[in-house]
Amino acid sequence: MMTTKTGEWTISRKEYRDKVLGCWYGKTIGGTLGAPWENNRAMNDVEFYPPEINGESLPNDDLDLQLVWLAAVEREGVRKLNERRLAEYWDNYITGPWNEYGVCRNNIRMGILPPMSGRVGNGDWKWSNGAWIRSEIWACLFPASPHRAVRLAYCDACCDHEGEGFYAELFTAALESAAFAERDIQKLLDVALAFI
């Protein structure tokens, strides 16, 4: 059995594995199914899967960024990881030039490091959904341990967000981490709200 630091929740390895696989399958499938309609603000009455995809998984920057964070954890270890270390990984591995990703990369290259990299020149995207849609990695690495998940979600979110965009990742990381062991929706919301 895995137990959190506080001893509030316990989760079996089998349950942990099942939830992590469900998380990543869901993220990959959702990203692939949604990609053809991303940035299309029209109502979509989708009745089919686009044949041009041919059953292949599409590139997904939301998932790719989490894999960069996983590599950072594997190489650096959790204790050494902070927003400055993530900024190094961002500069070396995140290639997306658009929106908050591009602003963050440019800021880091100019010496504007987190948390300022999420603020400076980022007025259009600092409150966007780019941070919270990549929060699953912290929950998967810290199941049933929202305090630990939120610590690294903070380091992640402040690279390219601030304000509501930043708080959204803290909220979802806490909720997702707690959801490894807690099933009561109101309790999950209470846990997540306590972090913002």
Enumerate the predicted regions with their spans.
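Structured, active/binding-site neighborhoods that engage oxygen-rich ligands
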Residues: 1-196
